[in-house]
Regions:
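A contiguous, surface-exposed recognition patch within enzymatic or periplasmic domains that forms
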Residues: 1-55, 65, 69-77
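Short, surface-exposed secondary-structure boundary micro-motifs
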Residues: 59-61
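Short, cationic low-complexity segments
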Residues: 77-83
Length: 83
């Protein structure tokens, strides 16, 4: 998730137990610089034959009027219930 000025953006995606994921078994990658933070979800590695396809689903939600998080206990009170 990402929090900014009272808004919380949450991105959900599945982890498939026993699947082969890239980058040492990770199902996400992050990138950050002074302007942005990116979280990219990754699906498992698969071998596709001609005419085959695969899919990867993300579910996004945006929550508003979230109080500023000042302590770890605030996460439990305001954020966990939204996950």
């Amino acid at each position: 998730g990402y929090f900014l000025e009272g808004f919380l953006f949450v991105k959900r995606f599945k982890w498939i137990e026993g699947a082969n994921y890239p980058d040492g078994g990770c199902n996400f990658e992050t990138f950050s610089n002074e302007d942005m933070l990116e979280v990219e979800s990754l699906g498992p590695l698969v071998v596709l034959g001609p005419g085959q396809s695969t899919s990867h689903e993300e579910r996004w939600s945006l929550h508003r009027k979230i109080p500023t998080i000042k302590a770890e206990s605030d996460v439990d009170q305001y954020i966990r219930r939204l996950l």
